[in-house]
């Protein structure tokens, strides 16, 4: 099967699963089952991780189980809570994928739309022997783009580079070493470009679109790219010298989301 067609089928299956799982009837479950499993394995997971702290949310049918371990910051002796703020990093990509599914369902975009359709005026999107980068390539790590944009200062804070303008400027000078859809290679850059494209297609800034389509309907009040002073005070810090509590609008699609265990439980 051609790589692009295979990618489309895989992505379509993922989309279908994500849309139908929430619609399925809630299964009958043992009321103690989820809690028993969590209590059996959670300590092992935490102590084997080497993490400063861990918040664990498990949803099984209509059960919701929350457990926390360790500290929210080195030496503060405070366990993570449901409202502890966490950088969810690459789980942000699942929310970007959800946005793609929603806009597909609304007829705003198509999987095979070329990225160039949503490029800023004057920007160039590279092709490989005429084969374009499509939205499904970006979403399935088959875009032939690198994992990260080359350059950037060493030891910089996380999720603040490259900005939208910087990545599109770089893309205009980039070349592809393989045809999009021909091979899989993980790319954070691709997911930020995907979010840019979806924002353009919807005609709204990504934070507004993100709030309207994902966080507001579910009451996810602590899920954001621009944390407030109160949210920054609740941010879990893994080590001294960790990245400051900045806005992370540069990494809208790949990893910039701040959230809480409580919000992730709603999602």
Model-derived segments and spans:
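Residue-level preference for non-acidic, small/hydrophobic
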Residues: 42, 56, 62, 93-96, ...
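Short active-site loop at a secondary-structure junction
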Residues: 48-55, 75-137, 176-189, 252-255
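Short, surface-exposed loop or secondary-structure junction motifs
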Residues: 73-74, 126-267
């Amino acid at each position: 099967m051609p790589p692009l067609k295979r990618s489309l089928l895989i992505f379509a299956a993922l989309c279908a699963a994500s849309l139908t799982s929430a619609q399925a009837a809630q299964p009958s479950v043992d009321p103690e089952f989820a809690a028993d499993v969590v209590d059996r394995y959670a300590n092992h997971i935490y102590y084997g991780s080497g993490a400063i702290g861990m918040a664990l949310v498990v949803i099984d049918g209509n059960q919701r189980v929350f457990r926390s371990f360790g500290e929210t910051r080195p030496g503060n002796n405070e366990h993570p809570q449901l409202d502890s703020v966490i950088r969810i990093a690459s789980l942000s990509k699942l929310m970007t994928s959800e946005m793609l599914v929603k806009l597909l369902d609304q007829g705003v975009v198509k999987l095979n739309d070329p990225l160039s359709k949503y490029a800023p005026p004057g920007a160039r999107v590279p092709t490989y022997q005429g084969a374009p980068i499509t939205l499904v390539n970006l979403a399935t790590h088959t875009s032939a783009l690198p994992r990260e944009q080359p350059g950037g200062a060493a030891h910089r804070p996380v999720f603040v580079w490259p900005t939208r303008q910087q990545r599109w400027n770089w893309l205009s000078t980039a070349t592809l070493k393989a045809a999009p859809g021909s091979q899989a290679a993980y790319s954070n850059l691709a997911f930020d470009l995907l979010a840019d494209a979806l924002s353009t297609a919807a005609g709204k800034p990504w934070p507004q679109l993100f709030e309207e389509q994902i966080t507001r309907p579910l009451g996810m009040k602590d899920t954001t790219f621009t944390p407030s002073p109160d949210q920054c005070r609740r941010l879990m810090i893994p080590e001294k010298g960790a990245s400051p509590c900045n806005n992370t609008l540069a990494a809208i699609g790949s990893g910039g989301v701040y959230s809480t265990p409580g919000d992730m439980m709603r999602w």
